[in-house]
Amino acid sequence: MSRIRQYESNAERQRAYRKRRKRSVHFSSKSDNWRTPEWLFRALNEEFTFDVDVCASAENTQLPVFYDKKTNGLKQKWTGSCWMNPPYGRTIGKWVQKAYVSARRNNAVVVCLIPARTDTKYWHRYCAKAEVRFFQGRLKFNNAGPAPFPSAVVVFKRNGTAVTIYVSRYGSYVIIVMIFERAETC
């Protein structure tokens, strides 16, 4: 239950609002870092055998090779099989674009766990051209309870097939299949 706060002046109220807004994260979540559920990472790693975690920290990586804030994954060349669970804040579009471009130009396979924000520009520009796996219900992340948003696994490949899949812990089934004849230039 939240309590109502009384402010002495309009200026004090505005300062408090700016302070709260600065602390908050885009998409109405208290954090923009969500550690991948173990069961999901294990299943995807078994399928794709990841070489590198392209945006991690020493505390949350599940792979021996990873890029953190210091090494800045956005500035690295992504090749091979890449895992990406990016910060879910304002920079997520840059991460998704980098995944798409790396798949097209570097022949990387980039598997992303991201919020299913189908109304965003990056979703329409990039995710719509990839394999997308939606989850039944909301994921429960390792460092928190259920996410306040729906999630999806997006798989970028050079000559990938755009496929939409719904996933539950009991299995999955294909909903839509669209085949692109050739890779688009970036």
Task: Locate predicted features.
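Class I S-adenosyl-L-methionine-dependent methyltransferase catalytic core
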Residues: K19-C186
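BZIP DNA-binding basic region
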Residues: M1-K22
